[in-house]
Amino acid sequence: MARKQNRNSKELGLAPLADDTSHAGPPGPGRALLECDHLRSGLPDGRRRKDWSCSLLVASLAGAFGSSFLYGYNLSVVNAPTPYIKAFYNESWERRHGRPIDPDTLTLLWSVTVSIFAIGGLVGTLMVKMIGKVLGRKHTLLANNGFAISAALLMACSLQAGAFEMLIVGRFIMGIDGGIALSVLPMYLSEISPKEIRGSLGQVTAIFICIGVFTGQLLGLPELLGKESTWPYLFGVIVVPAVVQLLSLPFLPDSPRYLLLEKRNEARAVKAFQTFLGKADVSREVEEVAESRVQRSIRLVSVLELLRAPYVRWQVVTVIVTMACYQLCGLNAIWFYTNSIFGKAGIPPAKIPYVTLSTGGIETLAAIFSGLVIEHLGRRPLLIGGFGLMALFFGTLTVTLTLQDRAPWVPYLSIVGILAIIASFCSGPGGIPFILTGEFFQQSQRPAAFIIAGTVNWLSNFAVGLLFPFIQKSLDTYCFLVFATICMTGAIYLYFVLPETKNRTYAEISQAFSKRNKAYPPEEKIDSAVTDGKTKGRPEQVSSSTLDNYVKNRIVYMDDLTFQET
């Protein structure tokens, strides 16, 4: 009987819950029969289709378009107008000082312009917990558009104002926007999605980063905005995604987990579940809502507390490793060689920007492929396989670059190697680290976890930009062996440590790490004062909420119904 009750409680995740949440009692008999019919006849494919509600799609697309898209766009948008921006720096300097700018000073100013984006990203990451606690996930994303719009106006007006400092400050502010976006957006998507599609929805972040990179490359073509007279408009375009998000996201609710566990607003949380999952699917979140019974008086964990907590030690280490490998795997270094490799392959210099679009296209297609298969293959194969393939192709690229003058067809192999590295990265390592950060931690730990992940991400980004020129100068084409080693090290670590998180609840993922951590979260510790024979040593969960009572009554009622049928 106990085994049967446990099984039916889990099967409740397939039954509709949302149409009647106004009272704590069980639903009517006729309704329960219909729901049990749904339990018996529901097909996995049908459930998967229902998971993708219109509201969920709009929230993910609007959230990503105004957030991760802008991050990707700002990674590539400065490449095409580089000569014109440097000329603008020189003209501004000469107008103020009466002499041309020194080449070393120009190089320094340009390096600051590019790298200050990462500094702003770090600042934005450190602001996440403070802003997110007050505003929540959705309103933090909305407020973040203020940074994007102000940065766009500064950068777009810098030429007209004759002040290159406006461009530098704008890049810094845009970095703040990116730091907040890459922490809050994955959190938001993770918390509004059912576990069956949490990976696919989380991959939207990476897909829109790639689309942003591709858009920056496309708009930077001379036929569009990549001309001397129009390059400021490349930065003005940033306003468009921000405005789209401001006009669409307010009509959607905040994260139901945030509303329930942090704001303790059960009515709004239930409505949020209904909006995102559809009324027939709200009960899919019952298993995750049960977490609220343990975390009713939730207190956000600080970064220092999370780093010290023994029961999440390996989760934290794994997030640090994956985020460090995400930036240190060498993808940014690939762009340094792209133009020269395309040139050696016989592509005319005027055509190289158009051929470079293929790299952005490969990025986008690989990210979309990952989003389509992640719930079938899982996180482990895509992440470990992605790093492993990158190590293999980096080794191949080292050989082809070393021998590229030996035969006319060798540079074409280098092009294939570059595209293969990009595809390997975007099919797994390009997005899954953000998904794992959201999946590894409970509600109270998640903001601190994203601060740690974001800090590692942006510091690693800055380190690559700072150190790669010296590595390249010292090792030349052999520099890619350094990145191959990093990728292989990451793949080996993840092979032995990373559990599969596909289709698992947050509690199940935490349990998967418990043996390795050799410690359990405080709420899982046994308290003999509140245990009895029925709970077998586990703490009895006391709930006073309307939602918990409703779920409890519903489970009992459906168990009785199933018992009568048998």
UniProtKB/Swiss-Prot annotation:
Keywords attached to this entry: Cell membrane, Glycoprotein, Membrane, Phosphoprotein, Transmembrane, Transmembrane helix
Carbohydrate attachment residues: 74, 90
Cytoplasmic-side positions: 1-51, 129-140, 193-200, 253-316, 376-381, 437-451, 500-566
Residues found modified as Phosphoserine: 9, 514
PROSITE patterns recorded: MFS, SUGAR_TRANSPORT_1, SUGAR_TRANSPORT_2
InterPro entries noted in UniProt: GLUT, MFS_dom, MFS_sugar_transport-like, MFS_trans_sf, Sugar/inositol_transpt, Sugar_transporter_CS
Compositional bias of kind Basic and acidic residues: 524-539
MF GO annotations: hexose transmembrane transporter activity; urate transmembrane transporter activity
Renumbered residue ranges of the record's region Disordered: 1-31, 524-543
Extracellular topological intervals: 73-107, 162-171, 222-231, 338-354, 403-415, 473-478
Catalytic activity: urate(out) = urate(in)
Cellular component GO terms, alphabetical: apical plasma membrane; basolateral plasma membrane
Membrane topology designation: Multi-pass membrane protein
Primary localisation category: membrane
Segments crossing the lipid bilayer: 52-72, 108-128, 141-161, 172-192, 201-221, 232-252, 317-337, 355-375, 382-402, 416-436, 452-472, 479-499
Protein role: High-capacity urate transporter, which may play a role in the urate reabsorption by proximal tubules. May have a residual high-affinity, low-capacity glucose and fructose transporter activity. Transports urate at rates 45- to 60-fold faster than glucose. Does not transport galactose. May mediate small uptake of adenine but not of other nucleobases.
UniProt cross-references to PANTHER family, sorted A to Z: SOLUTE CARRIER FAMILY 2, SOLUTE CARRIER FAMILY 2, FACILITATED GLUCOSE TRANSPORTER MEMBER 9
Family per similarity comment: Belongs to the major facilitator superfamily. Sugar transporter (TC 2.A.1.1) family.
UniProt name for this protein: Solute carrier family 2, facilitated glucose transporter member 9
Organism: Pongo abelii (Sumatran orangutan)
Recorded name of the encoding gene: SLC2A9
